[in-house]
């Protein structure tokens, strides 16, 4: 929306402290080669790649004073993108927080999620097209309880693939965003929803095919079953993810991660990417909120 207004937007992500922090003081990501240059993990790529796909430069690192000053040199508007790992390191002109009705109550029971909820000027309830009505109401009530002055926007999160017919009647492996499934507590993501929606014949259980640290992940997170978390906190784990995928007996891989996993591993099966977007329901919309910056 901001780009459509003609604004130059630069995103700043919260710290992803993997590897040698002394060489990560101020990192700039403008294209995919920068992800390789900085030896990004899958988890880092999941945060940076969607911005790059949208033509937005991303900064991250260690020294957030220096990062801010560098970002200011090339931006009209700076977007702090902290995920649910931090509240903003900077004083903001507008604070937008997204809440997930698939995890009702988490907005009050986790730090810094609760802090973000209380600080928000605008709160977006997404996934209302797939969430349970009672869970949506729980989230609404919790917002009213702790931040009644926030502007609330409700939205669907429609999913899409390039060719749904490729999935129909196929035996599939579903790969999902790792942190969402592990410490995020979710049992499924967009890939699983897509497999169901587009008529996969069977979603295989990847557990028997798991190797190394991927096998350990299943032992630690007992709620995981018909999905494979895209764990990749280093080259060794990426190879174990690749081996697990390649051992699986299926027709194709449905990837619900925010990245193109074929950039970092080499699956021996076709990979179909699932994408999702924000579809506001009713008014106000995000455009209404952001137009004051035009």
Task: List the predicted regions and their residue ranges.
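Acceptor-binding helix/loop patch of EC 2.4 sugar-transfer enzymes
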Residues: 293
């Amino acid at each position: 929306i901001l780009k459509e207004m003609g604004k130059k937007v630069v995103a700043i992500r919260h710290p992803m402290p993997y590897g040698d922090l002394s060489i990560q003081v101020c990192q700039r990501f403008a294209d995919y080669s920068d992800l390789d240059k900085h030896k990004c993990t899958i988890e880092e790529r999941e945060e940076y790649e969607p911005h790059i796909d949208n033509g937005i430069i991303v900064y991250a690192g260690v020294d957030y004073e220096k990062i801010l000053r560098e970002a200011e040199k090339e931006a009209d508007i700076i977007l702090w993108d902290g995920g649910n790992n931090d509240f903003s390191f900077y004083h903001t002109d507008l604070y937008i927080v997204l809440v997930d009705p698939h995890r009702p109550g988490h907005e009050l029971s986790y730090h810094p999620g609760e802090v973000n909820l209380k600080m928000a000027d605008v709160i977006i309830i997404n996934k209302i097209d797939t969430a349970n009505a009672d869970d949506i109401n729980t989230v609404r009530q919790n917002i009213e309880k702790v931040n009644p002055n926030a502007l609330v926007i409700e939205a669907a999160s429609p999913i899409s693939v390039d060719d749904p017919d490729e999935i129909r009647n196929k035996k599939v492996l579903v790969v999902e965003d790792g942190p969402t499934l592990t410490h995020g507590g979710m049992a499924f993501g967009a890939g699983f929803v897509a497999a169901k929606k587009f008529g996969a014949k069977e979603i295989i259980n990847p557990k028997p095919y798991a190797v190394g640290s991927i096998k350990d992940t299943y032992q630690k997170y007992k709620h995981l079953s018909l999905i494979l978390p895209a764990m990749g906190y280093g080259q060794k784990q990426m190879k174990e993810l690749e081996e697990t995928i390649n051992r699986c007996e299926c027709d194709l891989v449905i990837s619900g991660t925010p990245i193109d996993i074929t950039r970092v591993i080499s699956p021996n099966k076709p990979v179909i990417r699932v994408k999702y977007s924000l579809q506001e329901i009713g008014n106000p919309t995000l455009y209404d909120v952001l137009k004051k910056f035009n």
